[in-house]
């Protein structure tokens, strides 16, 4: 690998030419500016942090919007397209961006808002699916779990360990409550984690029955819903279908914004360039009339760069 000789370059010019000098340096791309100059009472450094942060934020938003478009409306490219790097933006395109930056960023935020709504909707679907999974073990129950019995009977819903069978439950109740005859336990479902059951007894015996079951590890399940578990599952499934339909509509709106891809790419480049420019502005020192900037340049590029600058500006 060849080692190319570098040379330090310091430029002092009139402040009225600052914008044009910096834009020319940025366009040529031959000078790497560095913040090695010390400020004085006359020459001071400008704080450009807040401006740069805003430019970088907008750049990030535009890049996110491009990623969303690539997700919902990918551009077909060749296998080696990624090796070509980013396409250079033309000066005329930048002029268009400057004129339309507000409108383009409005569309960027609109697209990202659509994506957030899709993300929120999918999270809501996951919650409803989890709720359905939680209700499945109780699907065989044909009364709302809010129902705690009648005027004379009590209904208890809850879970026991997975090792319990119908016989074990009946035997446990008989052994712990020999004096209670009117008590029936029904297993609604069983899996490797738990047994779900419903227990019916006389209301006067409810406290004793629950205490006996708790001694076996019973965990009571309470609910305030007026619907049966099956009805609650059906309601959530309907809500999921409605949300999925909403997501489809939102995704269609995002795909319809694919025509703005080039505008998003240009506005991304615009804010990247602005951020880089304001970084250089923060690195240079300036007085009321002049500014000084320092950096490194390839020795072979130094002469042509200096000649080009001198031909356009009054350098000191």
Model-derived regions, located:
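Long, charged N-terminal accessory/stalk domains
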Residues: 1-316
């Amino acid at each position: 690998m060849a080692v190319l000789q570098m040379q330090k370059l310091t430029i002092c010019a009139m402040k009225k030419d600052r914008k044009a000098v910096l834009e020319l340096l940025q366009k040529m791309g031959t000078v790497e500016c560095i913040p090695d100059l010390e400020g004085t009472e006359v020459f001071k450094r400008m704080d450009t942090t807040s401006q740069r942060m805003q430019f970088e934020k907008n750049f990030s938003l535009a890049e996110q919007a491009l990623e969303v478009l690539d997700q919902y409306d990918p551009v077909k490219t060749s296998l080696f397209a990624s090796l070509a790097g980013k396409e250079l933006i033309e000066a005329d395109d930048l002029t268009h961006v400057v004129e339309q930056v507000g409108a383009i960023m409005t569309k960027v935020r609109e697209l990202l808002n659509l994506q957030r709504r899709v993300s929120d909707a999918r999270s809501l679907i996951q919650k409803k699916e989890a709720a359905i999974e939680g209700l499945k073990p109780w699907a065989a129950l044909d009364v709302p779990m809010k129902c705690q019995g009648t005027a004379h009977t009590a209904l208890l819903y809850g879970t026991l360990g997975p090792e319990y069978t119908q016989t074990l439950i009946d035997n446990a109740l008989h052994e712990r409550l020999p004096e209670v005859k009117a008590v029936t336990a029904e297993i609604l479902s069983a899996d490797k984690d738990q047994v779900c059951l419903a227990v019916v007894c006389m209301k006067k015996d409810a406290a004793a029955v629950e205490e006996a079951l708790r001694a076996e590890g019973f965990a009571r399940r309470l609910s305030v819903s007026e619907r049966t578990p099956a009805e609650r599952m059906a309601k959530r499934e309907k809500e999921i279908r409605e949300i999925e339909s909403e997501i489809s509509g939102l995704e269609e709106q995002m795909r319809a914004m694919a025509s703005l891809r080039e505008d998003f790419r240009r506005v991304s480049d615009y804010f990247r360039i602005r951020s880089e420019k304001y970084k250089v502005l923060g690195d240079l020192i300036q007085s009321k009339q002049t500014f000084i900037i320092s950096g490194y340049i390839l020795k072979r590029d130094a002469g042509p760069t200096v000649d080009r600058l001198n031909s356009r500006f009054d350098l000191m």
